[in-house]
């Protein structure tokens, strides 16, 4: 069943220059006080072009300083494996291999396997091999826009296709055709959150909230003895320095990932057309639909992250169809109608509170 709420549309002014803001951010409604029986600790840091915040119950007397060091080391390992911003990373080596086999680590293999799984399940709406197309539109690691033409788009598309990836599981190796480029940006942050959560659980920590770049995974309860309450951003004015909440959602041993087209885009100075970073792998062009943001809830942040991207490609109608046909996924979608009026859909299974706006 649909759950719809109409909200006031934001006033927008098209400006003829390039705007780029790293990441999508989710407000975290963290508990202010701790219960008398168990202290909670919060660790903060920077990673993957964003920030992280980890809050956990200190019922196992974990050394916070030591854990903080392990977290940073783990995030560094993930970057060394899957960051296109690191020239010496495994993914950079794979993309420069010109068809040769490259030995990869367990983390790379897990993310690659999940990426292909989601690509198949979404009929290519999620595709980890569109790195060449992403770079053409100026959303790659170097942020340099190419000469965008129908010819160049088709040439870039010809260098993509997840079904062209070859994997040798016994040798832990991968091969991609010459000119192909793998990009895990739409799934790696979710994987990082899951990996950090598993690190906490290996320490015996049963109550925690892990947040990295707006992607969240929770378990157990917060310091007030409640399930974790997480805020979802309202996708408002692209130039706004502050942020407003659209909704507050209660997570019960669940993960949340949000994707949207309101913070990473550029505007054509001549036409005034806004081109957002979500690329449709079938057309090779930025996805054009009425969906402003998709927040997906799943047990794993990895899958929530990937499907949030797929939903932005699909648009709200296809995403609603997916959510209502899959018992393991839930979502909050913010979209507009033809007149620019805003609406919110949310899965009825979610415990959600809509935030009133003026």
What is the role of each PLM region?
Residues 2-21, 25-27, 32-358:
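Mature catalytic core of soluble alpha/beta enzymes
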């Amino acid at each position: 069943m649909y759950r719809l709420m109409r909200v006031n549309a934001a006033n927008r002014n098209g400006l003829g220059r390039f705007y780029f803001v790293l990441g999508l951010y989710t407000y975290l409604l963290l508990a202010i006080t701790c219960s008398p029986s168990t202290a909670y600790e919060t660790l903060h840091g920077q990673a993957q072009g964003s920030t992280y915040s980890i809050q956990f119950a200190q019922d196992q007397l974990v050394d916070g300083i030591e854990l903080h060091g392990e977290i940073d080391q783990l995030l560094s390992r993930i970057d060394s494996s899957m960051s296109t911003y690191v020239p010496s990373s495994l993914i950079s080596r794979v993309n420069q291999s010109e068809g040769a086999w490259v030995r990869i680590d367990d983390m790379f293999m897990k993310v690659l396997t999940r990426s292909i799984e989601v690509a198949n399940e979404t009929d290519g709406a999620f595709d980890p091999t569109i790195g060449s197309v992403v770079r053409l539109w100026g959303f790659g690691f170097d942020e340099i826009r190419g000469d965008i033409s129908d010819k160049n788009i088709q040439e870039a598309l010809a260098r993509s296709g997840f079904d062209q990836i070859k994997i040798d599981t016994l040798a832990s190796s991968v091969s991609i055709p010459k000119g192909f480029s793998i990009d895990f940006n739409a799934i790696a942050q979710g994987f990082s959150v899951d990996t950090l959560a598993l690190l906490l659980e290996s320490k015996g920590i049963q109550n925690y909230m892990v947040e990295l770049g707006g992607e969240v995974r929770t378990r157990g309860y917060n310091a007030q003895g409640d399930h974790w309450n997480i805020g979802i951003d309202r996708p408002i004015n692209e130039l706004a320095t502050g942020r407003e909440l659209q909704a507050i959602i209660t997570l019960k041993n669940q993960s949340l990932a949000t994707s949207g087209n309101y913070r990473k885009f550029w505007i054509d100075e001549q036409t005034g057309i806004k081109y957002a970073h979500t690329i449709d792998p079938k057309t090779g062009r930025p996805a054009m639909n009425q969906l402003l943001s998709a927040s997906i809830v799943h047990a794993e942040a990895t899958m929530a992250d990937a499907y949030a991207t797929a939903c932005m490609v699909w648009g709200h109608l296809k995403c609603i169809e997916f959510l209502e046909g899959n018992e393991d996924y839930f979502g909050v979608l913010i979209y507009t109608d033809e007149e620019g009026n805003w609406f919110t859909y949310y899965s009825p299974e979610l415990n959600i509170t809509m935030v009133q706006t003026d």
